[in-house]
Amino acid sequence: MTILHGDDRFYNNIFVQKPIRPCMQDLADLMGNNGNMWDDCNVLTGTFKFNGYPTFDEWNRQFEGYCGMGSETTGNCYYDHLPVWASGNLYFNGARAWEKETDAVTDTEHTVDISIEEKEDGWYLKTNLYDIIKEENDGIISTETLGMAFEPEQKYENPDGSPIIFNQDFFGNHRNVKTVAGPFTDKKASEQKLF
């Protein structure tokens, strides 16, 4: 079986398009449509790079009436992309969502500033993101949400086989049943020292 990418899952992430450095834009313009297989000048942010990939249901329907490789009912399903899952992601500053994503929020009204700042005692996130995100609109991600990985045909779970439940943020703060997308539960958590 030949796999042409896919089997990717994106849940409750925040995508912020940073300004493209002029030299990177110049390189992309120079390459135009003459990119090579190693460098496509990918400086744009979001899951839109998966446009054209199937959802699981679309992918699974290819195998209905399966009668063996080469049969008319299966066509090229062995050489197509694997499915993609995406839901509840937030997109800012021109970042773009996958065309089939559910519950995506694309904010074209606000500009998000985000950077890492070094202080005497460590590294901190500097952002206005949590002034913009005020609503808890995503659910908790778990083994049940993630389903099974394609190749091992196994669920995403802890090493001991127990279910994964992402109910804590980066610092171990408990998330509510309805939570904010991203690594932190709220603005206060995002202001803590990272490292």
Residue ranges and their predicted role:
Residues 19-26, 95-101:
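Short glycine/acidic-rich loop motifs that flank beta-strands on beta-rich extracellular proteins
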Residues 1, 26-27, 42, 71:
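Substrate-binding/catalytic cleft of secreted carbohydrate-active enzymes
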Residues 32, 37-195:
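Surface beta-loop-beta hairpin patches that serve as ligand-binding interfaces in beta-rich domains
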Residues 1-6, 79:
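Right-handed parallel beta-helix/beta-solenoid
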Residues 7, 12, 87-88:
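Extracellular/lumenal ectodomain signal focusing on beta-strand-rich modules
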Residues 11, 16-18, 92:
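Feature marks extracellular polysaccharide-active and adherence modules
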